[in-house]
Amino acid sequence: MSRTWRALVAVLTLLLLTGCSAAADALRPDPTWMPQPEGPPPADLPQPPSTEGAPSPGAPGQPGGPEAGTADDPNVVAIGLTLPWGLAVLPDGTALVGERTTGRLLIVQPERAPAKPVMRIPGLDGTGDGGLLGLALSPNYDDDGLVYAYMTTRTDNRVVRFALRGAVTPVLTGIPKGRTGNGGRIAFGSDGMLYVGTGDAGKPALSADRKSLAGKVLRVDTFGRPDRNNPDRSSPVYSLGHGRLAGLCLSGVNQVYTTEPGQGGQDEVNRVEAGRDYGWPGGTRAGAAAPDREIPAAVGGLSGCAIIERGLFVTSTTGRRLYALPLDGSGQPGSPADYLVGAYGRLRTVVAAPDGALWLTTSNKDGAGKPTPQDDRVIRIMPPAGSTNSPA
């Protein structure tokens, strides 16, 4: 973060604190809020999230402006895609988006324009909930131009890497696959290690099996070798007891968060610690960690997650909304506020860009949604005011 941005955030935070009767109001949902389009920021001046309290006339969902989610909504930057799942923001401000079942990778502009196909991943099995899943840029992308992807093949789930339009090279193979529970989120931490979220492959008992790569968070280097700081330095397993793991993201201090279905009709947000067991299946094993935050599955279907400042953003498929959870000084997630309820249908992925924008994908053509003629879509918004600051 630049010094200019830090100064702006400090001033704006002070204004928010002095203008509110209670610090907890910082994340209270504003029923009038709808996303406002923001163009790409200047390359030499990163811009913080907007602090305007309400949209101006003419913004989506306001009098005189287009309704959010309609053909005229300027926050929708790409349309007509087939189950966009993985997304990574490139250094030039565009986004690389992967289609789960087709294996296509496309470049999406930060303003409405046709998505440009660049390559197709070979050897893909897109049946069930498998296919081309998470994407992440190499920590040395400016030098090596490598993209990492989690994919399902006929025999396994695996992590691969490639340069755009280049050959695909396996990095980590042998992750169990299934009709469901393929997992598939990946992210690099500030330690340069690759964190891989895997599902239980439809076999819940694998999640508790320390010898299986299913139902785990894995931590490996850029070549797929176990991090020597893992609980077992010979194993890629970082944590276990995860079920149909749907989201994985990291904070700037390398705190790992996951989102996943839980027990008893609740979805979970977990703050993951090395070596911990997160209880799937059953949640009653001795020593199993309790969820850090639960959200009823009826308005959950939690999927991707992303972090900006002190706000944790989580997409919801079943609930068709975006959740924002404040993070306190220890990284503990607080009570969720919900946004974009029903505006774009089932939301699958959310990624935070360096300019403070959130990129999201919809999943309305997966058989469980109600697709519009524009689906599936990629959306780019600025977070609502106050959602990136934790209450004092």
Regions picked out by a protein language model, each given a short descriptive name:
Residues 8-14:
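Sec-dependent N-terminal signal peptides
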Residues 116-128, 168-182, 220-240, 274-298, ...:
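Surface-exposed loop and turn segments in beta-propeller and other repeat-based domains
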Residues 152-154, 256, 263-267, 271-277:
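Short edge-strand/loop segments of extracellular domains
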Residues 237-264:
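Repeat-solenoid scaffold signature
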